[in-house]
Regions:
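Conserved HGGG/HGGXW glycine-rich cap/lid loop of the alpha/beta-hydrolase fold
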Residues: 12-69
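Active-site loop/oxyanion-hole signature of alpha/beta-hydrolase fold enzymes
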Residues: 42, 49-52, 59-99
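Conserved alpha/beta-hydrolase "nucleophile elbow" surrounding the catalytic nucleophile
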Residues: 98, 102-107
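Flexible "cap/lid" loop of the alpha/beta hydrolase fold
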Residues: 108-116, 120-151
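Hydrophobic, aromatic-rich cap/lid helix
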Residues: 164-189
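Short beta-strand/loop motif that positions the catalytic acidic residue
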Residues: 196, 202-204
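Conserved alpha/beta-hydrolase "acid-adjacent" motif
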Residues: 209-214
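Catalytic active-site module of serine/aspartate enzymes centered on a nucleophile-bearing elbow/loop
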Residues: 229-255
Length: 255
């Protein structure tokens, strides 16, 4: 595969970075909190896997992440805004519809997009997010304090320590991430989730203690399928082979 080129476009005042590789039916990939398009999708082999399956593979850096604009006002990370960034990318590329797959926070953004603009989403794949789309507001706000701490050694909360270490590993802007976690903790109600009318696959690792049950969420979304990713936690589910195989099957079978 040739070198992957990062491209950019403006969504209002925010410059968003993305990659656009291959030909075929388009799929847009939306990464999780404190990650980026490379860490979530390129390095674990998703871009290669999808291209080999004949898919045009598009992945963006969410606002505040990767090579996209860093923002420090929590209000600018509302999930409605982040979901609309995906719609803006579709507009920029001249795509009326695409399959959309998100992981963790990216799955939340994908669900919000599917509800607000279902006509733009051919199918939605939610990885690393189950019933916590409904039952809570995403990752706990204590993670913001962990990101703002002087060093990882100052963080005692296990989940906060994990995300602080991950943010350092991905060389992220920790203050932008702290603003993101404070501003993007919106949920959908059961009645709002029931309005989603696109084919949906919900995949969660059996050792994931962050996402919540995929089956509980699937029961609320008409026609949704749930998938267990065996033996994987929140971080290790992303590149799992069984997850990839299930996604490829789902893409082949969806209308």
């Amino acid at each position: 595969m040739s070198e992957i080129v990062t491209r950019r476009f403006n969504a209002g005042p925010v410059e968003l970075a993305y990659i656009d590789e291959g030909d075929g039916e388009p799929i847009v990939l939306v990464h999780g909190f404190a990650s980026n398009k490379e860490v979530n999708w390129v390095y674990p082999g998703w871009v290669t896997t999808l291209r080999r399956a004949g898919r045009r593979t598009i992945a963006l850096d969410n606002r505040g992440h990767g090579a996209s604009t860093k923002l420090y006002d929590p209000a600018l990370y509302h999930t409605d805004l982040m979901a609309d960034d995906i719609r803006a990318l579709l507009d920029h590329l001249g795509l009326a519809r695409a399959d959309v797959m998100g992981y963790s926070m990216g799955a939340r953004n994908t669900a919000f997009l599917a509800r607000a603009h279902g006509e733009r989403v051919r199918c939605a794949i939610l990885g690393g997010l189950g019933i916590h789309l409904v039952k809570d507001g995403g990752l706990p706000g204590s993670i913001a304090a962990a990101l703002e701490a002087p060093s990882v050694e100052d963080v005692t909360d296990p989940q906060g320590r994990m995300f602080r270490a991950f943010a350092e590993q991905t060389k992220s802007d920790r203050l932008a991430l702290a603003a993101c976690i404070r501003g993007s903790r919106q949920s959908l109600s059961p009645s709002e989730v029931a309005q989603i009318a696109v084919p949906m696959l919900i995949a969660v690792g059996t050792k994931d203690d962050i996402a919540g049950s995929p089956r509980e969420l699937a029961a609320l979304v008409p026609g949704a399928r749930a998938l267990d990713i065996p033996g994987r936690d929140h971080m290790l589910s992303v590149g799992d082979r069984a997850f990839k195989e299930a996604v490829l099957r789902f893409l082949e079978e969806r209308p």
